[in-house]
């Protein structure tokens, strides 16, 4: 895909997230690898619903600005994940309602914030690790995500939001949407007796994904 096509897709996805209520104001950011040495990321303070192709930030892997506006302050953790995991091609970070609500709950399992109860959660991301709370923009977030970048596709930032990776922007977006729907179901089912997937069922789904 050309640089221009990647930029147009990012603008399109940002608007789609915004119009469907996955993000508000200037919250959240998106990024995608353009090649081995360059990353496209949303600019600082930008609304995902009002992105423009011309203003999207192009960075090298060291964070130097090659084109467009100044990048989001959270571009640091995007770059850290790309450096650690070559298979990570795109990243979506949102403060979507249900995943952010989930991130504010105490005593979540740090290895998997939601015990699997649908096959789609397992097939899409496998699990969602919980990152301890740090202020937005803290270098500790980049450190934590870098340390885990090879161990999963989805990470819940405590009291903050979600970070989701994919093989491209569309895949990362699809993964994020599946997670938000799973979190919505989690809250909808509160007070009900949930039938969780068994370890055998989870393992079967994981094996089918290999």
Swiss-Prot record:
UniProt enzyme class: lyase
Cofactor binding: number and manner: Binds 1 zinc ion per subunit.
Active site per database record: 74, 120
The enzyme's E.C. designation: 4.1.1.104
GO MF term list: aldehyde-lyase activity; metal ion binding
Cofactor: Zn(2+)
Pfam families assigned to the protein according to its UniProt record, in alphabetical order: Aldolase_II
InterPro entries cross-referenced by the UniProt entry: Aldolase_class_II_sugar_metab, Aldolase_II/adducin_N, Aldolase_II/adducin_N_sf, OtnC
Catalytic activity reported: 3-dehydro-4-O-phospho-D-erythronate + H(+) = dihydroxyacetone phosphate + CO2; 3-dehydro-4-O-phospho-L-erythronate + H(+) = dihydroxyacetone phosphate + CO2
Swiss-Prot/TrEMBL keywords: Carbohydrate metabolism, Lyase, Metal-binding, Zinc
GO cellular component: cytosol
GO term, biological process aspect, one: pentose catabolic process
Residues that, per the record, bind Zn(2+): 74, 93, 95, 160
UniProt similarity note: Belongs to the aldolase class II family. AraD/FucA subfamily.
Role: Catalyzes the decarboxylation of 3-oxo-tetronate 4-phosphate to dihydroxyacetone phosphate (DHAP) and CO(2).
Name this polypeptide is given: 3-oxo-tetronate 4-phosphate decarboxylase
Species of the source: Haemophilus influenzae (strain ATCC 51907 / DSM 11121 / KW20 / Rd)
Lineage of the organism: Bacteria, Pseudomonadati, Pseudomonadota, Gammaproteobacteria, Pasteurellales
